From Swiss-Prot:
Entries under InterPro entries matching the protein: GPCR_Fz/Smo-like
Signal sequence, start to end: 1-23
Record keyword Metal-binding present: no
Location(s), subcellular: Membrane
Protein family according to the UniProt entry: Belongs to the G-protein coupled receptor Fz/Smo family.
Domain of life: Eukaryota
Protein name: Frizzled/smoothened-like sans CRD protein J
Gene3D superfamilies in UniProt: Rhodopsin 7-helix transmembrane proteins
Keywords, ordered alphabetically: Coiled coil, Glycoprotein, Membrane, Receptor, Signal, Transmembrane, Transmembrane helix
């Protein structure tokens, strides 16, 4: 962690920096001292202490009251700038891509939408979900870091401006994409095998997914769970890992299981129909579902590691800062302080793993666009759309005829 080397330079430049600066207790830059006896209450307000995690000599006891900066010291500022830039730029692209697919597959252009066409509605719902992720990213782009860091050393909480809204939008979009990915895999199997689904059954599935998504997105507000996490996310999201497991990761695990079954059944159906001239057109959606499966799998592995090792990562950072200051005070011959030897710098979260996580979440909206925009199905939807037929450029039955022939 290169950040810690900058701490060393600060210490050296100030000859070990005293804990008293102009009569005020000071912490090493970029940390900030906060006098408190209620660290738990402060956490609820958004303050994150470095938490040395072990008894300290009196001369160093002030370090337990040092606040972590927002955004956190797990990454250098250049790294955070890269993360923020990725979310802003890629989020805007994903928002636009999702909106285009929503328009084509939604009721504005899709004549089959209100006929409860299973496939087009499923694609629309997935695009709608990634659209909400894009909206949350645009909120971050508009408000910048102030949305997650209302103060230099305080992380946003649900009571802060825009954080609750951003958290709900992100959760709603991300969770929705997960559940509709699962159904997209089942839809692929139905299309590849030629099986049909009762429209009433599909209506029940449609309503159930959206109702469940709404409940799981708004319920965390009852526990004041939305806020800025000091690692993993750039947006506001669910703070406590047990709440994350209950309201997101459990649903993702179930969706991955369904997705895996759907992928296997689709492959099996395609193998059985290798002589069918329509087999190739089912391969592209299968590739999309497989890529989504891999991305969601990476997300759960990454966040699982983060959640399980969060306290460990904090302790590494805290111990390294404590070691540096201990040695600095020892060199100043402060009574009672013993030189602790060379301070080691252990890796916590790599830049590439964090970047990949943020990238994969934003890639969802771009993928649905890339895989469906130029498909034959999309071209038929455009040809049969209200707008195309209004100007005499299309055939209102084009998509339905294709559907009858192949589905």
């Amino acid at each position: 962690m290169k950040f810690l080397f900058s701490v060393i330079l600060v210490i050296i430049s100030f000859l070990g920096i005293s804990k008293i600066v102009n009569g005020q207790i000071a912490c090493p830059s970029p940390f900030l001292y906060r006098a408190t006896n209620d660290t738990v209450g402060d956490y609820d307000l958004g303050y994150q202490y470095i938490n040395i995690g072990k008894p300290l000599p009196p001369q160093l006891s002030f370090l337990n009251n040092c606040l972590m900066p927002c955004q956190s010291s797990f990454f250098e500022q250049d790294s955070w700038n890269s993360f923020n830039k990725l979310v802003k730029q890629m989020g805007a692209v994903a928002f636009t891509c999702s909106a285009i697919i929503m328009i084509i597959y939604g009721p504005l252009m899709n004549r089959s939408f209100f006929k409860f066409d299973r496939h087009t509605i499923t694609v629309f719902c997935f695009a709608l979900s990634t659209f909400f992720i894009g909206v949350s990213d645009l909120m971050f782009a508009t408000n910048d870091v102030d949305m997650v860091c209302p103060e230099s050393h305080r992380y946003a909480r649900q009571t802060d401006k825009t954080c609750a809204t951003n958290g709900v939008l992100f959760q709603f979009g991300w969770l929705g994409s997960v559940m509709w990915f699962a159904f997209l895999s089942i839809d692929g199997f139905f299309r590849a095998s030629g099986k049909k689904m009762n429209k009433i059954a599909f209506a029940i599935v449609l309503a159930s997914i959206w109702i469940l998504n709404i409940v799981l997105s708004f319920a965390p507000m009852g526990g004041d769970q939305y806020g800025a996490y000091f690692v993993g996310q750039v947006n506001c999201w669910i703070l406590v890992k047990n709440w994350q497991y209950a309201f997101f990761w459990a649903e993702l695990i179930v969706s991955l299981a369904i997705g895996f079954v759907g992928i296997c059944l689709t492959i099996y159906s395609l193998i059985r129909k290798t002589s069918d001239g329509n087999t190739l057109k089912h391969v592209t959606p299968l590739i999309l579902v497989f890529l989504l499966f891999c991305q969601y799998l990476y997300m759960i592995i990454f966040y699982g590691i983060i959640n399980e090792k969060k306290d460990h990562y904090q302790n590494i950072l805290a111990e390294q800062v404590g070691c540096i200051f201990n040695n600095a005070l020892a060199k100043m011959k402060v009574p009672g302080i013993v030189y602790a030897g060379e301070c080691t710098f252990n890796e916590t979260i790599t830049f590439s793993s964090q970047y990949a996580f943020l990238f994969f979440v934003r890639l969802l909206g771009i993928e649905i666009f890339a895989f469906y925009l130029f498909s034959k199905e999309t071209l038929l939807l455009i040809k049969s759309s209200y707008i195309a037929t209004m100007f005499g450029l299309g055939d209102k039955d084009a998509y339905d005829v294709e559907l009858e022939e192949t589905d």
